[in-house]
From Swiss-Prot:
Organism name: Chlamydia trachomatis serovar D (strain ATCC VR-885 / DSM 19411 / UW-3/Cx)
Chain intervals with Low complexity compositional bias: 200-211, 225-238
Protein name listed in UniProt: Translation initiation factor IF-2
GO function terms (MF aspect): GTP binding; GTPase activity; translation initiation factor activity
Family: Belongs to the TRAFAC class translation factor GTPase superfamily. Classic translation factor GTPase family. IF-2 subfamily.
Composition bias, Basic and acidic residues: 139-166, 252-276
Length: 892
């Protein structure tokens, strides 16, 4: 044990000596010891203390060993002992002793010491304490004889206590840079020894010339005067507290200095630039490309020369024009704004003058390309004008196109069935025609192309379209009913198109048939019949018996000869769309009527909004055709979309040209739509109007047109109708989702709901209405519009009672004793209180009793007790009126 202990003490002694030498405390201790020995040898107090201590040594009383003896010389025997010390142990004290006789430093010796030297010693001891753990290692000096300080001398002795708190051991984690190498590899490369040595040497020289003062020392020098180092014995306790606080402050200041120095050293060795790269480490930069620091780019003016000549097509947006001129859109907008024209980037320029002026301002000649406009205007010339401009030698006689028009249920379709020897009327929903039928029938007088138009008021557009495309109009009038509204409308369409009119007075087999009434009505409409000396041919017919049908055919053939109907079969085909629909297997199909030229299988067609290539072509008997001559209606497939009923078509060179034409047309439509944005109806908002939103799906395009026309003609000052979408086909899932999002109603006409969309209707709670007859759909929409209106409330008086007395109840409140003066007071009806002809309150009855029994009603002349619901301010003499609220639906 002794060997182990000696070895341990020896190691600690060697370590402590090395640390002391490294900190430079040995020289300072020698200076302090020499200064102290010269003063204490001449003082008589030190000799007296030596005698007292020698006497106490003989007495054998042990003296407490000081923790740190800063005044001992190198010759004094030292013993370094390591021990564990808890936080509850006594605070270590620093006692300054003289080297000669090992006595304590008294107050008389304090003036002999210089303040800067004490400050430097304190700093050096604190620096030494920072290097070594004072909580685990304690230095002690064991003298040859034990010493004990008397109580009287303790008061005169200067004891400087320094509390050293245990320091937490800082564990330095290994630092790895972005290269994956340890920081020690970088220290060897970035550390410059000569620069550090020079700095250290200059620091030592400065320390030798003038001791360094820390933050605590400088603070003490500022706060304390120069002569406060020597104080009387009575102020010793306060001096101890101040010295302890100053030492703590000095310790904190030294810790901050040390942390700053350590941070600076770390930055010097592991300095990184703003992108995380090591500064000065060229080896690691070989594989990493150092990012160049981005500086603020100076505004460079790019001088772009505008082209001298460009060619554009109108209309064009400001953005597109700027791109063609190699300029910014803001430059064009600025130039236009200077001259009083306000435009934005997406505005459309359709004026040739404005476009040419812009080019003149920027030194550019702008030429308007008219080739695109010529493509868009392919269908502007009428078919009749084209036929008139054709060489007469190429023209041949074509079949007449006859349209049967008239009021609903007057027998138009029945006459056509009799001519064709078919039965189409029986298969139609509601026994009315709701589609435009086009077919060719062979008669004894030749072939006739027949158009069967609907007679219902909703199909006004179909009748107008039939009048435009046909050559002769057969006006069917029922002899027992006379001319009706739709008959008059058909006459107006025929007059507007300047078409020959032939009147067929139908139902001549009925007993109430009156032809004179029909003649008179025709004369009133400026259609004077031949029987009355006019030019309008009239024929009495009966679709059931067949009477007069042969005469009708002969009259049609005669009118066709008079008109001299001709066409050019060698020209490219032109015509009109009679009807269109979406077929489940064939896609978009259309019934077209060829007016001029010959339509062949495989040719490319252009409509208003779509194009196509004729893949198949069938007649009314579903027979495949290779070509269609003038006045022939055919059903074609292979279209890109569903064309609208009434749209003209023309044959073009190939499908590529057709695509280019449609693309140009769609672009123009989008620009026009951008110019004519739908503005909100502020009048409807101010008038608090209701709006019914509809989504229409139908089997054919003509049905959509007719249904939409009928719905929009429903006039109402309280409800507006808005059609969000109108398409051909079955009701799909997207339609249901659109209706749910916009809170709209889906109207299906001659169509059905797709299978995968049916469960979505229940989940999203969307209202879907399916119809086969158009007037049923119109009536249902009117009911829906009426349901949107709030009902009108009407108050009907049932009776009245006068309050005769009031009774207070702690549980129920105020009970009113009343006498019924008029009618009947009913318990479940409303009550109003009237005082001086003014209504004070409206509410309901909480209880109605007569002779302590609950009753439902009390009649005139009887007394009752009434308890009102949450009202107790009625007075004697007030009138209680009982009334009933009746709600009446509003009218459109």
């Amino acid at each position: 044990m002794e060997k182990v202990k000696l070895t341990k003490n020896l190691k600690l002694k060697i370590k402590n000596a090395q640390l002391t030498k490294a900190a430079g405390l040995d020289k300072l201790k020698q200076k302090l010891a020499q200064a102290g020995s010269s003063d204490t040898k001449n003082s008589p107090a030190s000799k007296a203390q030596t005698k007292e201590k020698s006497s106490k040594k003989t007495a054998g009383t042990p003296a407490p060993a000081p923790e740190v003896d800063s005044g001992a010389t190198e010759s004094t025997a030292r013993r370094i002992r390591a021990k564990d010390r808890s936080s509850f142990a006594a605070e270590p004290t620093v006692t300054t002793a003289l080297p000669g006789d090992a006595s304590h430093l008294t107050l008389d010796a304090i003036p002999a010491m210089k303040a800067p030297e004490i400050t430097s010693v304190t700093q050096k001891e604190q620096t030494l304490g920072e290097c070594t753990d004072t909580s685990s290692v304690q230095q002690e000096e064991k003298k040859e004889s034990s010493e004990e300080t008397s109580p009287e001398r303790v008061e005169e002795t200067l004891i400087i206590r320094t509390r050293t708190e245990p320091k937490s051991v800082v564990s330095i984690k290994p630092k790895f840079g972005p290269t994956g190498k340890h920081i020690n590899h970088l220290l060897a490369k970035t550390f410059k020894a000569p620069a550090k040595e020079t700095k250290a040497a200059s620091t030592e020289e400065t320390t030798q010339q003038q001791p360094r003062q820390n933050d605590a020392a400088s603070y003490n020098n500022k706060q304390q005067p120069s002569g406060t180092s020597s104080r009387p014995a009575s102020s010793a306790p306060s001096y101890r507290r101040e010295s302890t606080n100053n030492n703590n402050n000095a310790k904190r200041g030294s810790e901050r200095d040390r942390s700053k120095r350590s941070d600076e050293s770390v930055k010097a060795f592991t300095g990184r630039d703003r992108y995380g790269l090591n500064e000065g480490s060229s080896e690691e930069d070989k594989w990493r490309k150092k990012r160049v620091h981005k500086t603020k780019k100076q505004a460079e003016e790019h001088v772009v020369q505008c082209p001298a000549h460009i060619k554009i097509a109108l209309p064009i947006t400001v953005k597109d024009l700027a791109a063609e001129m190699k300029l910014k859109a803001s430059e064009l907008i600025q130039k236009l704004f200077i001259h009083g024209m306000t435009y934005v980037v997406n505005d459309v320029l359709d004026s040739q003058t404005v476009v040419e002026y812009i080019g003149l301002e920027f030194g550019c000649t702008i030429e308007i390309d008219s080739s695109a406009k010529e493509k868009l205007c392919l269908l502007e010339n009428a078919v009749r004008d084209e036929v008139n401009a054709t060489d007469p030698e190429k023209l041949i006689i074509r079949s007449p196109i006859v349209a049967f028009m008239g009021h609903v249920d007057h027998g138009k379709t029945t006459i056509i069935d009799a001519l064709r020897q078919s039965n189409m009327a029986a298969s139609e929903a509601g026994a009315i025609t709701q589609h435009t039928g086009a077919f060719k029938c062979t008669t004894p007088v030749g072939e006739i192309t027949v158009l069967d138009t609907p007679g219902h008021e909703a199909f006004s557009a179909m009748r107008a379209r039939g009048a435009e495309v046909c050559d002769i109009v057969v006006l069917v009038v029922a002899g027992d009913e006379g001319i009706k509204e739709q008959t008059i409308e058909a006459i107006e369409h025929a007059k507007g198109a300047n078409i020959t009119i032939v009147v067929a007075i139908n139902k001549c087999d009925k007993p109430n048939f009156n032809v004179e009434t029909v003649y008179r009505q025709l004369a009133e409409l400026d259609l004077l019949p031949e029987a009355w000396g006019g030019s309008i041919a009239t024929i009495n017919t009966s679709a059931k018996t067949g009477e007069g049908l042969q005469d009708l055919l002969e009259m049609l053939a005669l009118q066709a000869e008079v008109l001299e109907l001709k066409a050019d079969p060698s020209a490219r085909a032109r015509g009109l769309v009679i009807e269109s629909e979406l077929h489940k297997g064939l896609g978009a199909v259309a019934t077209v009527l060829v007016q001029n030229g010959t339509l062949h299988l495989g040719e490319a067609l252009v409509f208003n909004d779509c194009y196509g290539k004729v893949k198949t072509m069938h007649d009314e008997h579903n027979q495949l055709l290779q070509s269609a001559t003038p006045s022939t209606p055919v059903l074609i497939t292979g279209l890109s979309a569903i064309p609208k009923a009434g749209d003209p078509f023309i044959v073009v060179k190939n499908e590529k040209v057709a695509k280019e034409i449609i693309s140009a047309r769609l672009a123009g439509q989008q620009r026009s739509a951008a110019l004519q944005k739908k503005r909100p109806n502020f009048d409807a908002v101010l008038q608090n109007k209701k709006t019914l939103k509809l989504i229409i799906k139908a089997d054919v395009q003509g049905s959509i047109e007719a249904l939409a026309h009928s719905i929009l003609n429903i006039r109402s000052e309280k409800v507006d109708v808005e059609i969000l979408s109108s398409e051909v086909g079955d009701i799909s899932e997207s339609d249901i989702r659109l209706a749910s999002a916009s809170k709209a109603t889906v109207i299906g006409f001659h169509t059905s709901v797709e299978s995968h969309a049916e469960p979505l209707i229940k989940n999203l709670n969307v209202k879907v209405c399916l119809f086969d007859i158009i007037y049923h759909a119109v009536d249902a929409i009117k009911e829906i519009m009426t349901g949107l209106l709030d009902p009108i409330a009407e108050e009907k008086n049932l009776g009245a009672a006068e309050i005769k007395a009031t009774f207070k109840s702690s549980q129920l409140g105020t009970i009113y004793g009343c006498l019924v003066t008029e009618g009947t007071i009913v318990r479940n009806q409303k009550i109003r209180i009237i005082r001086d002809k003014e209504v004070l309150w409206k509410g309901s009855l909480s209880s109605l009793k007569r002779l302590k029994e609950d009753v439902k009603e009390v009649k005139k002349g009887m007394e009752c007790g009434i308890l009102l619901d949450n009202y107790q301010q009625a007075q004697v003499g007030d009138i209680l009126q009982c009334y009933e609220v009746i709600y009446h639906p509003q009218k459109l």
